[in-house]
Curated annotation (Swiss-Prot):
It catalyses: (S)-dihydroorotate + fumarate = orotate + succinate. It is found in: Cytoplasm. This is Dihydroorotate dehydrogenase (fumarate). GO terms for molecular function: dihydroorotate dehydrogenase (fumarate) activity. Homodimer.
Amino acid sequence: MSASLAINFLNHTYENPFMNASGVHCMSTKELDELKDSRAGAFITKSSTTSKREGNPEPRYFSVPLGSINSMGLPNEGFDYYLKYALEYQKNGSTSTPLFFSVAGMSVEENLKMLQKIQDSDFNGITELNLSCPNVPGKPQVAYDFELTKEILTKVFEFFKKPLGVKLPPYFDFAHFDIMAGILNQLPLSYVNCINSIGNGLYINVETESVVVKPKNGFGGIGGEYVKPTALANVRAFYTRLNPTIKIIGTGGIKTGQDAFEHLLCGATMLQVGTELYKEGVSIFDRLERELKELMDKKGYTSIEQFRGKLNSL
């Protein structure tokens, strides 16, 4: 019997756990439609701000041997552009590939304003609040401020009654895992997304003796294979600390079916792909699906739930 990649996430069955990471191949309606028509199990919009943003000056993205460095600065077409797409997509009944909606306001007030609009709209999908963008000059990552994170999410859940997840930055200390999990466990949160890129890395071109991206004097978020061990650690740390009702999306370093298997083994339910989607395009979902199935067949697993979260310790 061939392996099934079907998973249940927030009371909906998805054909497979793969989706794009917000920020990659989801800026325009054309790119969103390409995701919709791909083998992805779900897809998510670009993280939106209230108004359209051009983002940081170019060059702001650079492919490097084991991944990428970027300092995009949240370029997007604006909240209303993506909400219109989401509502039309929903109205047309094309929900075989579920759509998530991502917001990343430049301030607490902006996030609350956008989430209130989603709450008041007919959108009935899942919303992701990005509290972890590392590439907006002068704007610290909210989720590294634990008290502010608690304050924001407490305010959000006073009025937001639809499914909501949060995208987190990577944490590197057990005390930080404990503190953040303690905050999130008090809230009616649907999921956490671990992780956003590792902020403020630096990559150097030895030939020119210079940095490779322009913003922030070359400092940028690191993605791809470089970040997989950190991503797996965050997925596992939150899986073992959060209430079982709070699901986990694993993001970071997914290039092969084996990478996907490792994220699932650590406890992720769904998986987002960023750097490798940028490099390969939407056909990556066909390959990842095939490779994950082949690995599961080889191990004798017929469903993801047979091994998800069951990482062995020594």
